[in-house]
Structures are given as structure tokens and as C-alpha cells.
Amino acid sequence: NMAKGSVYYCSECGYKSVKWAGKCPQCGAWSSFEEVEEMPRDVKKATSSVSVASRASDIKVYEFKDVEYNKEDRYKTKYEEFDRLLGGGLLKGEVVLVTGNPGIGKSTLLLQVANSYKDYGDVLYISGEESPAQIKNRGERLKISGDGIYIMAEMDILNIYEYVVSKKPKVVIVDSIQTLYNSSMDSISGTPTQIRECTLKIVEIAKKYNISFFIVGHITKDGKVAGPKLLEHMVDAVFNFEGDEGLYYRILRSEKNRFGSTNEIAVFSMEENGMKEIKNSSEYFLSEREEKNIGSMVVPILEGTKVFLLEVQSLITDSGIGIPKRVVQGYDRNRIQILTAIAEKKLYLPLGMKD
């Protein structure tokens, strides 16, 4: 009866330590260590009763030339910008992590794309945060018929595993990974160990049975995925939802994509009946701009392979104190300092006494 050993995981970055620490040595977060009981190595060996020979017989190996692959084998939606971010559509067996602040529109967008994916087969929506009635209510507001979309209010990954393997839906949406747990482990849902183990199970199902997954992940105050950084390395693509609550638009940014280009962005607007993609985002961003405005300029910005036209505004006033102020929003402050110095030195603009 060997006792289980305790280790500590940082809830911010997943750093593992044998003893508790007030500050994480890897990411610098304070009071982020959580105690997790791990099974001793001897017990793991004892529980693994399957012989090496039988395990080897179950392993499938393919010769490179015999692997079948269809380049057009992607699920597409009615949202061209969303498909562009995925590299032309969702591949079979692909695992996509969608992150963002709570309430920014992750669940809404995924419910809308689920309405498109149902044309290829059954779509399973697993929710640990909302009841089926709440999801149905939101779906009706989004004008979703619901035929072919199944809702599952389950949080145990082992039960989810059995159901998905038996029914084999084409696409599965998990909302969210922080609510799932593995009942064979002692730790509660949301801990780094649980998030890692549940994601491993999801990736296993996806690759073994060619089932595509979307995983919703919450982010911390500093913009990182809540849970181990390892989570981002385990999935095929990471999309991050950006935008302030006061803005009508949302930006979906591709931060990682094994099957497409990274740093691509798609722009959506928040409407009464859900998310609406903005194809001509430059026109949208400049719609309220007045021409011949002093201190206003339109500049092209490259994001991935797409060019956006954005407005840059500047305001210069006499400084009332000896040290002039430099207030910057949406731009790197150090670069503004360099540009100001260049303008003063080379263009002879007296900005040294201007705010």
C-alpha cells in the first residue's frame, strides 16, 4: 500500500514542482501552485496488466506511399473568413482550441458554425457550463434549426469518450475544457493535470477515429490560456477571440495552425442574431472617418496574408511642464518615442516641448 506522492502544478503555465512555492519560477505568477496527487510508478506498473506482445499487435503502422489523403477533404461553413483561418476548411481529425474572455462570443460562433457542419453529418455539442435548455434558447435566437446537432451535458471525459467512440459524430464541440474532468483521477476539474489529461483523451479520439474537435478554453487576466501551456502544443490550431465589450466587432486571430498559415485574422460584428463576418473590414473600420481631418491618416497594416486599411490619429499640444507627455493607444510606446526623435532630428519639428 504505497502512498500517493504529491506534486505541485502552476495553474498559469503548468510548471511542475515537488514542493510548493509562492512564486512560479517559470512564469512569475504568485500563489498559482496547486497540489495534485500522482500515482506512484510501482502502482502504474501493477495496473498495466496488458503484455507488451499484445500491445504491439494492436499498433497500426502505415507505409508512407499507402497513406490515403484527400486534399479536398475539409468541412466548410458558410463563413468564408472562418474557413480561410482554418486553411480552407476544417480537416477530419483536427483539434482546434478557441480561446478568449468569457462572454466575447466563442460559444455563439461555434454554435453558428455547427449549423453548417451538420450538413456533413452529426455534430455533438458538449456543454459543462450551460444546460441543454439554455443552449436551445440561444440557438433559436441565432435562427438555428437544430436538426443533426446533439447536445450533451456531461463533464466526465471517460463517459464522453465512450459515447463519441460509439456514435462517431463528424464534429464535436467541447465548451469548455476547464469544466471537464477524468473521474479516475483525484483532482478536481480545471486543474492543470485534469486539463492536460482530458485534452490528451480528446486528441486520442480525434486522431484514432478521424473526428474533428473544437475546444473552448478560457484565458487568464494576462491573456494566457487558463491551464498548462502544454495545452496549446497538444492541439493542431489555436484561435484567439479579441475585442472589448464596448466594441461591435470581434477579431478572431490564428495564433497557431498546423494546416494553414498563422497570424491570420478574421473580423466579425456582433449582431442581434449572432456573429456576422465582415469581408471588407477596411471599409468597416473607416466607415465613420471624416475626410480632411487634421491629425488623421489612413495606413495599410499587414496581418498574415491580408492587408487592412486603418486610421491613425494624432494630437499635438503645447506642453505645460518641462517633460512632455507621450500617451499612446494601440501602438508600441517605444516605437513612438523613436519616431518622435527622428522627426525632431531629421525633419526639424520642435516636438521636444509638445505633448
Language model regions located:
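Flexible beta-alpha connector loops of hexameric P-loop NTPases
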Residues: 72, 147-154, 182-196, 324-333
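Terminal-proximal interaction/regulatory segments of ATP-powered molecular machines
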Residues: 332-355
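The Walker A/P-loop phosphate-binding site
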Residues: 50-142, 161
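Substrate-engagement module of ASCE P-loop NTPases
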Residues: 193-214, 218, 234-245, 344
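Loop/turn-to-beta-strand initiation segments
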Residues: 122, 148, 168-171, 209-214
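Conserved nucleotide-binding/hydrolysis micro-motifs of P-loop NTPases
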Residues: 102-104, 129-133, 141, 155-159, ...
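Short cysteine-rich clusters marking metal-coordination/redox-active sites
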Residues: 10-13, 24-27
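Conserved P-loop NTPase
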Residues: 25-33, 39-68, 165-167, 171, ...
